Regions:
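Internal alpha-helical scaffold of NAD(P)-dependent oxidoreductase catalytic cores
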Residues: 5, 12-15, 92-179, 236
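Short phosphate-engaging motifs
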Residues: 42-43, 67, 108-109, 148-149, ...
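Rossmann-like NAD(P)(H) cofactor-binding subdomain of soluble oxidoreductases
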Residues: 5-10, 14, 22-92
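Glycine-rich beta-alpha junction loops
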Residues: 64-66, 85, 106, 171-175, ...
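NAD(P)-dependent Rossmann-like dehydrogenase/reductase catalytic/cofactor-binding core
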Residues: 165-241
Length: 241
């Protein structure tokens, strides 16, 4: 993610005075903002070391699930700038279209972070640490778990010598539909239809690990459909009263 953010900052006309990926020894003592984009497990140590001698400067981190308060007691001005997107080094992204979620230690600092965020994205939102944790959790379901299902599908196809490419039109249409429909309304397949014979036959083709995943996912689809239908019925009943 850091590489893509760096490109976006440069394209927006910002002067990047230093990039430090391995060591903080060459980190300048003065800059308008220090952006810490490291893995979550390293963030606390990086903050502690980066802030030394720069306690009056503005620091932000980019982690979706980590608290802004990691900076508390280390520096005076701090915040979060979280781009919600999946990043891979060899894939270009349009940063202007990526939603950025920000928060800050105080109102003046918020305005500085907001200006920085607005310069690289058209979609900037204020969000607290508590709410951002749920946003990041939702992203894990929508992106990480979904991609894992692609990997499982690729394994199933490979058993019969079929290329993963045959899934791409299906994957693309599934993604397009949720631009217009609620995900539950867009759900198709044997689980949402309650076709138990098909589910039993398909799970029998799988090893124990995949069969367990298959049945858990199928039960979740059925439960979600039932919950969604009940909620919609209550809403419709309320409108008729």
């Amino acid at each position: 993610m850091a590489t893509h953010l760096l490109k976006a900052l440069l394209q927006a006309g910002h002067e990047v005075v230093s990039v430090n990926s391995r060591t903080l020894e060459e980190l300048p003592l003065e800059a308008d903002v220090y952006i810490l984009s490291v893995k979550d497990s390293a963030l606390q140590d990086v903050i502690r070391n980066a802030v030394k001698g720069r306690e009056g400067q503005l620091f932000v981190h980019t982690a979706g699930s980590m608290s802004m308060d990691l900076f508390k007691g280390c520096c005076a001005r701090y915040g979060v700038l979280y781009p919600m997107q999946t990043f891979s080094l060899d894939r270009e992204v349009n940063f202007r279209e990526i939603p950025l979620f920000i928060e800050a230690s105080d109102a003046a600092t918020f305005q500085q972070i907001r200006a920085l965020a607005d310069s690289v994205s058209q979609h900037v939102y204020e969000l607290s640490t508590a709410d951002r944790r749920y946003l990041h959790l939702a992203a894990v379901f929508a992106c990480n778990f979904t991609n894992h299902c692609y990997a499982l599908a690729a394994d199933v196809l490979a058993q019969k010598g079929l290329p993963f490419d045959v899934m791409l039109p299906l994957i693309d249409e599934t993604a397009r539909k949720v631009h217009e429909l609620h995900p539950t309304d867009a759900q198709t397949g044997p689980a949402v239809r309650g076709d138990q014979n098909v589910m039993d036959a398909q799970s029998a083709l799988l090893d124990d690990r995949l069969a367990t995943i298959y049945m858990l996912m199928s039960e979740s689809i059925k439960d979600e459909k039932e919950r969604y239908d009940q909620l919609r019925l209550k809403e419709d009943t309320g409108h008729r009263v």
